[in-house]
């Protein structure tokens, strides 16, 4: 297990290097002058030129890249052009609201998605199955921003129970978490149902039934354990989506997270923050994929990581 983890961590290095090069190149292709953004729109030419020298933008692009990469390796992402604060501190401040939002949306969507998927599979072809899968299709089809606006219009504003802006108290997370997790719950329900029905048709399941084992024991010990393996992969991907793809939901609810920070940084052309956020999103997906692989062995000890 340890050797597998070490090998996977080493494999992350070339991936991150390639991604860092692509991110750097993409940022340099964006319109606008970073030195002017740093010095201010009304700054004189001399101040803009001084800012260009201070930020190292007068150096060749390869030298700029390796300087940024060296700082990145030491946890230094530079300073923001807008507030002159360290990018690491700005991202860290916005990371926790996004993490809490992702965890809340993930928790309820996984529980509901797994439950609905299993019930639908057990009631295959019956009215319960048709009803639950119809709701799941509806959940997948509804855009998150539209669902969020509906909740604000018909739940938050008429009753005044939930806040629709910011993160000031624990209850403020309810509507954004529901909005963020709705499509995930629907996807998980359909995926769990498919995985459950596929495993239920395997020979070892029929053998277990022929031996006279109780249906509940066969369901949870033989079917569910093996059906969870592909489901775990989907869980990892969906959690990565919740962490990196909450931009729209954060915008709708004015949630002070990474998505809101990314939009602000794009609008103000704050390139160091954009670079740092993209690298963070990529790192999140890589780490989540590693954790998913490790969970395989926990769910089914017959699987060996090599």
Model-derived segments and their meaning:
Residues 23-29, 59, 70, 134-163, ...:
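Membrane-water interface segments at the C-terminal ends of transmembrane alpha-helices
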Residues 26, 30, 38, 42, ...:
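Hydrophobic aliphatic residues
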Residues 17, 21, 138-145, 235-240:
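Hydrophobic alpha-helical membrane-insertion segments
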Residues 6-16:
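N-terminal signal-anchor/signal peptide hydrophobic helix marking the start
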Residues 15-66, 85, 156-175:
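Hydrophobic alpha-helical transmembrane segments of membrane transport/permease proteins
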